[in-house]
């Protein structure tokens, strides 16, 4: 199995993904070699094109971090393009119906499980000449719960063959429910999703801030620009006596 994220989850280990939302190969490479298990490539809330993302994934071939793409929607075109350019994870936003997540699994999977067609792409150069035979075993589907409607179908969603992770989108769940984290009704929804997902043997995901929550193993870390800002602030906080002796060297 070349999807190391899936392998780690099968072993009961937590995984963390850094978020990419700008089409810069250098940023992608820095994140891909920073220790993240995967990269959450954000195509729902960014203007990035599949061509730009394909170039980043190719630049990062061989990096430890596995490419996951949050597609704009669970359409055949979006899922097909994402898998053809080498994503091993399809993150499906706003799953409010079982039909939506089933469609994602169908389009991400080759027959007999799905209806993904053969086409040109860089997947073979990235993941091996036997990709057609191994893709279904390695590609993951992550369904996102972002609303009370998603909460209600969490167990049924997790039970769909081909769904690996049910992810609680903390901010959107708050927005759509008009409840705040920490409030009893909000926490009850989170617990319902967690318990329902674990009951059918699937993985529960959430934001990195929830890394200490019981039962969660799949986490989304902040985007690269946020991490860059935090890193710069931490570096400057260490400065006590002016610039380094050699300009640009570590202090």
Where do the language-model regions lie?
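Hydrophobic faces of well-ordered beta-strands that scaffold small-molecule active sites
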Residues: 16-19, 39-41, 67-71, 90-92, ...
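N-terminal amphipathic alpha-helix/helix-capping segment at the start of soluble metabolic enzymes
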Residues: 1-17, 128-137, 192, 247-251
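Glycine/Thr-rich beta-alpha phosphate-binding loop at enzyme active sites
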Residues: 168-185
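Conserved anion-binding
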Residues: 77, 83, 87-161, 165, ...
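C-terminal alpha-helical cap/extension of soluble enzyme domains
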Residues: 116-127, 139, 145-152, 184-251
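Alpha-helix-loop-beta-strand connector modules within alpha/beta enzyme cores
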Residues: 50-84, 106-114, 134-137, 182-205, ...
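Conserved N-terminal beta1-alpha1 strand-loop-helix module at the mouth
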Residues: 1-67, 71-74, 141, 162
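Short, acidic/polar
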Residues: 20-33, 73-81, 148-160, 206-210
């Amino acid at each position: 199995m070349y999807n190391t994220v899936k392998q780690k989850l099968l072993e009961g280990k937590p995984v963390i993904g850094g978020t990419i939302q700008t089409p810069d190969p250098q940023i992608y490479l820095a994140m891909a070699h920073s220790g993240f298990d995967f990269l959450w490539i954000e195509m729902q809330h960014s203007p990035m094109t599949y061509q730009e993302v394909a170039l980043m994934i190719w630049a990062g071939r061989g990096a430890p971090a596995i490419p996951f793409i949050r597609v704009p929607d669970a359409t055949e075109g979006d899922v097909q393009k994402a898998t053809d350019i080498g994503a091993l994870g399809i993150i499906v936003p706003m799953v409010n119906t079982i039909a939506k997540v089933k469609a994602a699994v169908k389009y991400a999977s080759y027959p007999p499980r799905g209806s993904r067609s053969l086409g040109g792409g860089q997947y073979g150069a990235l993941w091996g000449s036997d990709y057609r035979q191994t893709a279904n075993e390695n590609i993951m589907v992550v369904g996102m719960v972002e609303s009370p409607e998603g909460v209600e179908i969490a167990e049924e969603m997790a039970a769909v063959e081909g769904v690996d992770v049910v992810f609680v989108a903390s901010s959107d769940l708050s927005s759509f429910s008009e409840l705040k984290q920490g409030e009893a009704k909000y926490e009850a929804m989170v617990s319902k999703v967690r318990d329902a997902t674990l009951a059918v043997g699937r993985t529960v995901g959430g934001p990195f801030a929830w890394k200490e929550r019981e039962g969660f193993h799949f986490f989304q870390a902040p985007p690269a620009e946020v991490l860059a800002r935090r890193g710069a602030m931490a570096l400057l906080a260490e400065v006590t006596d002016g610039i380094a002796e050699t300009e640009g060297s570590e202090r």
